[in-house]
């Protein structure tokens, strides 16, 4: 299978995991939430939780590839999306080898004027559980 084909499978796996956890924790959400891109075109954010006004984007990368180069665009997409809150989830083993990418995204998030968080996939379940607890309180 091509590198691109593997990337699509791994990206779909991450999205399925996010969907499973959102469902298990009783979040009501939309998949492939439509908005207008920075270029004025139709675009989709992976998930949107209306109760939290939270847009979620998943990026998975297992090894060398171009996903990391898309992170600046993803951060701009959060600014363009109408949600006040954003969550960027890094899945795959690649991100731990390049911590500067997460640090850059977090720095950009702080400058954005929105509440955007950047987490690794392994922290997702705990993050969602804490968010669910805060929502219930």
Residue ranges and their predicted role:
Residues 9, 91-137:
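Domain-level recognition of nuclease-like catalytic cores that cleave nucleotide substrates
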Residues 40-43, 73:
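Alpha-helical scaffolding within the catalytic cores
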Residues 60-109:
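Catalytic cores of nucleic-acid endonucleases
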Residues 1-36:
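Acidic-basic catalytic patches of nuclease active cores, encompassing PD-(D/E)XK
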Residues 28, 52, 85-86:
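Residues at the starts of beta-strands that form the adenosine-phosphate
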Residues 26, 83, 113-115:
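A generic structural signal for alpha->beta connector loops
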Residues 43-56:
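Active-site beta-strand-loop-beta-strand hairpin of nuclease catalytic cores
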Residues 56, 87, 117-119:
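Hydrophobic/aromatic beta-strand patches that form the interior of the parallel beta-sheet core
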């Amino acid at each position: 299978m091509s590198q691109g084909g593997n990337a699509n499978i791994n990206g779909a796996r991450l999205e399925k995991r996010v969907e499973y956890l959102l469902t298990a924790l009783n979040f009501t959400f939309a998949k492939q939430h439509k908005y207008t891109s920075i270029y004025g075109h139709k675009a989709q954010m992976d998930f949107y939780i209306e109760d939290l006004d939270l847009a979620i984007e998943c990026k998975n990368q297992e090894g060398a590839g171009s996903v990391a180069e898309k992170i600046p665009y993803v951060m701009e997409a959060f600014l363009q999306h109408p949600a006040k809150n954003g969550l960027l989830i890094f899945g795959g083993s690649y991100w731990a080898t390049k911590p500067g990418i997460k640090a850059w995204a977090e720095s950009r998030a702080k400058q954005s004027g929105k509440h955007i968080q950047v987490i690794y996939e392994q922290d997702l379940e705990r993050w969602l559980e804490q968010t669910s607890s805060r929502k219930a309180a």
